[in-house]
């Protein structure tokens, strides 16, 4: 008897020690997700507002817990249960119960989304062995137009609901595959008319703030622009040759970037178990296809899979996870060009196609760019100025501006969480090789070289190469009032030491060059995924 009591006491002490060591998780978003205890087990309580009453509500929850999954845990990974039944008003929250795996402690919430819109984002566990669980739930809900609370159930409706089958809930539900759809010609490469601009504008109009689009719904259908409407807009801008004559020598002809001005910009994140980290940029070219660089997903012995990658569309400020009209798009597949070899120094065929699980709805902030059309010969674009846009994050997920500011006293950090846009004059290989002989080994007949024409204020304020962290970003050239994707960023010239003895930090030379994968050389391969 005494031995039995001692064994029980040891088990109790062990459980208490584990609880103190691990600690009970705290909800990262207590307004929409809370941990509850019913006396026997822990569960999660989630409140979600349906973003669109005409579509099924698709809930996705990603959980993180310490250790390897046990046999008992593998048999039951948890589930999402719809708590509130009956009809809902559009503004009323829908309540869900998150049942956790049979484990001593509830897992931490890593990500929660509704119809691909991230509504809660947290950090995972920190341990040598980690287990991630993804739960999904899809249900078509009935909505009523009146303002009665959805939590006050109709007794007759409740009786009907009791006879219904259990709501479909499975840890790994299969998405219904939709056919790939090429971007409509009316949309691709065009910007909402309220945000549209040409590469070169009159200097006096550069500092006029561009307002947000006058749309009350961030996920409405796009505004189509007919060919004859371009003539109506043309009088607002001047020809590039005319604009260059009145530009100042400080290269300040680029407008301040606003949200929605580059709606095909994609932010690609990778799941590193404990957090989502920014990895690369990308370019949306259809409702399901994003183009990026191969080295973003395959470098030496590391290869990211589709389950480890999440693509954000419609994003501008990467610190703001709740931007209207943006969405988090799960990835169905990552296809790296078969000729790409991460073990070699050459960046030949450094291109990848990311296929999204679901087609995205185009809106003011999410639109595709056009794939290149016309000749694929590089010599035909030498001398032209393209546009490169992307976020300049390094691999530690700090912006290069912030990193420099922490190292240099008196330097103020600029907001590099927003994308930066720069001009990229396309040059021949000879000029590129003269700038840096190492580019000869990096390039091939399927790459081209372009410079970075930085604005003076960026060069002096940031004092660092803010343009070398934009792997996967696209280089766009305007053709017939449309922006066309011609290249993706592969390799940049390393920063050089400044001759100024007082400044020991590295500066990006004003005439920096970057190697791009020539998208025009891979159109046949890309089109196979788009059609």
From Swiss-Prot:
Residues 1-19 form the signal peptide. Keywords: Developmental protein, Disulfide bond, Glycoprotein, Hydrolase, Protease, Secreted, Serine protease, Signal, Zymogen. The keyword Mitochondrion does not apply. Glycans are attached at residues 272, 397, 445. GO terms for molecular function: serine-type endopeptidase activity. SUPFAM superfamilies: Trypsin-like serine proteases. PROSITE patterns: TRYPSIN_DOM (PS50240). Proteolytically activated by the protease ndl. CDD domains: Tryp_SPc (cd00190). InterPro entries: GD_N, Peptidase_S1_PA, Peptidase_S1_PA_chymotrypsin, Trypsin_dom. Expression begins in previtellogenic stages and is seen in germline-derived nurse cells of the germarium. Expression continues throughout oogenesis with transcripts from the nurse cells accumulating in the oocytes. Most abundant in the ovaries, the level of protein decreases from the moment of egg laying and is essentially gone by 4 hours. Belongs to the peptidase S1 family. This is Serine protease gd. The lineage of its organism: Eukaryota, Metazoa, Ecdysozoa, Arthropoda, Hexapoda.
